[in-house]
Design a protein with these regions (language model features):
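Short coil/turn segments at secondary-structure junctions
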Residues: 10, 117-121, 218, 243
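Bacterial N-terminal signal peptides
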Residues: 19-33
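Well-ordered beta-sheet/strand-loop patches within structured domains
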Residues: 38-66, 128, 132-135, 155, ...
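N-terminal secretory signal peptides that target proteins for export/translocation
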Residues: 1-17
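Cationic-aromatic interfacial patches
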Residues: 41-160
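Phosphate-/polyanion-interacting regions in eukaryotic proteins
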Residues: 152, 164-171, 180
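Short, intrinsically disordered, low-complexity terminal segments
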Residues: 11, 17-20, 36-39, 51
Length: 547
């Protein structure tokens, strides 16, 4: 048989050349020729019959083929069919570049299914199979390989779901190659992550960043083998120009500082153990973070392009972004790393702010934290008001708290407005089922720490006034005066945003830099580790594994 020889030739050349481009070109040429040649020898009426039978099990696919009078969608010499097939094969060839499971979209598997095909029955089956592979590819590219909530219940993303028949109808009426491009996440971050993935893969295949640093700590001015190992690793990472210096000198201090900045830790230029541990992280681990970030971008197609707020939990930061540019940034404190206190990921609409807010204590905090304290001392939380179901203030001294448990405690708690209020002097509201919001805090000292996971889930802002001024600048020529006027009332004042602002609580451990390169953050809640494990189960692999 001629075609088995072609297949063997393809495998031989792909292995011999070890060049992806050559392999992909061969795949395209061979695949198109095989598909087209088989279709030429088939009987059209019989093909339609078997297309109808093969598509019967999938209602959407069956409806689509019925609308085409069961004409093949991919096979044959029809110009549109050939163009669609070329675009599909090109897309499937590139699937691993996007961090998709290579096994699911393997051209070898599809080609093996048509090996020796000579019957209309198999040809009809093949056209339908190509349709099913296409639909899976389109779904994965537009919504992700995984379902976020199945990985972690606190990852809530409104995925860009589309019915199968919609993909097929759009492809049928579109330029094939342009259609496949539109399936990609539209964000600039996705494009940058693709470039960084390719860069890291090249580094990985060339041996990585070199030997690990074995020292526990290195001091400025120190000389020796440990400093040389630090120097060489930072040179490999691109933080230091090639040098033979064996001294922890000023250029090396600067390189360490830049590395620390890119990893979200205190940039003091000292190579302490925590910094050295980060420098020793392998290319493989960094590449995993990028693959997870690509998957997260596929979950987040709805992120705004105009004014929006981004709260990156791992970066402990909140940003206001206008037309792609960060116009305001402040430090944050996020939820403590505990199953009940971790901050969730979701998107919503920031609608208003409350100046001089009261704190209505969540019941979980009331019964789990404050009730045990009140059982010991009736005045333990005298900074809070105790109220009954009618809103009447109750004196704690009149209550025997020992008679209540978490289920029977009947009272609510409120902290009045004031400088010592747990919410500070302002809160920013985007009403949601998680009861999460952004707010000021009287505990400013926590913002001096690198890792700031201390709250019950809400997001504390280091500079809430600046955040408020930037938001209000869209509706006032003097936002500071507007805000401070409300502050002067010493009671709750609600300020509506004339144009509500989309807000996104995200979780990124790999973040691209505009000029190239990556920043990394700690997987504070372990969510990315769970995502990577799930991606592996689905068949996503590192380049070193694929060859």
């Amino acid at each position: 048989m001629f075609y088995p020889l072609i297949m063997l030739l393809f495998h031989y050349l792909a292995i011999l050349c070890r060049k992806v481009l050559v392999a992909l070109v061969l795949v395209n040429i061979i695949s198109i020729n095989i598909f087209s040649s088989i279709a030429e020898s088939a009987e059209p009426i019989s093909i339609k019959q078997f297309v109808a039978e093969a598509s019967f099990r999938n209602n959407h696919v069956s409806q689509f083929y019925e609308s085409r009078n069961y004409d093949p969608f991919w096979l044959g010499n029809n110009v549109d069919n050939v163009a669609r097939l070329q675009a599909l094969i090109s897309a499937l060839s590139d699937a691993p570049m996007h961090g998709l499971p290579s096994s699911k979209f393997s051209l070898n598997r599809i080609l093996s299914d048509i090996y020796g095909v000579s019957y209309n029955e198999k040809l009809g089956y093949l056209d339908v199979k190509l349709t099913l592979v296409f639909l899976e590819y389109a779904s994965v590219m537009t919504t992700g390989v995984l379902i976020p909530e199945k990985i972690d219940k606190k990852i809530v993303r409104a995925n860009f779901y589309k019915k199968n028949i919609s993909f097929l109808k759009e492809l049928q009426s579109s330029d094939s190659f342009e259609f496949f491009k539109k399936l990609f996440p539209p964000s600039l971050e996705y494009k940058r992550l693709m470039k960084e993935k390719k860069r890291l893969e090249k580094i990985l295949l060339s041996g990585g960043w070199g030997a690990f640093i074995t020292s526990d700590e290195l001091l400025v001015g120190e000389r020796g083998n440990g400093v040389v190992m630090l120097r060489n690793r930072l040179i490999s990472m691109g933080y230091l120009s090639p040098t033979y210096s064996a001294s922890y000198d000023l250029p090396l201090v600067k390189a360490v500082k830049n590395f620390q900045l890119d990893n979200g830790i205190r940039a003091d230029g000292s190579a302490n153990q925590s910094t050295l541990n980060l420098i020793n992280i392998t290319v493989e681990e960094r590449l995993k973070s990028v693959l997870v970030a690509l998957e997260r971008e596929r979950w987040s197609r709805t992120l705004s392009v105009n004014r929006h707020v981004i709260v990156n939990l791992t970066d402990f930061s909140a940003k206001i972004v206008d037309s792609g540019k960060v116009t305001f940034k402040t430090k944050t404190v996020i939820g403590f790393d505990d199953s009940n206190r971790r901050s969730p990921e979701f998107s919503d609409i920031l609608e208003f702010m409350v100046v001089n807010p009261s704190w209505y204590v969540p019941r979980s905090i009331v019964v789990q934290e404050y009730l045990p304290m009140l059982k010991v001392n009736n005045n333990a939380v005298d900074f809070l008001e105790l109220r009954d179901e009618f809103g009447t203030i109750i004196e704690p001294s009149e209550i025997d708290f020992s008679t209540f448990d978490q289920n029977t405690f009947p009272y609510r708690m409120r902290q009045p407005p004031g400088v010592n209020n747990a919410l500070g002097l302002v809160k920013f509201m985007f009403p949601n089922k998680n009861n999460i919001y952004l707010h000021d805090t009287p505990s400013k000292g926590l913002f001096d720490l690198d890792v700031r996971a201390f709250s019950h889930g809400c997001i504390r802002l280091s500079d809430p006034f600046g955040f408020a001024y930037t938001l209000l600048a869209a509706q006032s020529t003097d936002p500071a005066s507007l805000f401070r006027s409300a502050l002067g009332f010493k009671k709750e004042v609600k300020i509506e945003l004339e144009k509500p602002v989309p807000i996104h609580l995200i979780y990124r451990t790999a973040i691209t830099k505009p000029g190239g390169g990556l920043e990394f953050r700690k997987d504070i809640y372990g969510r990315d580790a769970k995502i990577w494990d799930a991606l592996q189960v689905e068949g996503v692999v590192l380049v070193s594994v694929t060859g």
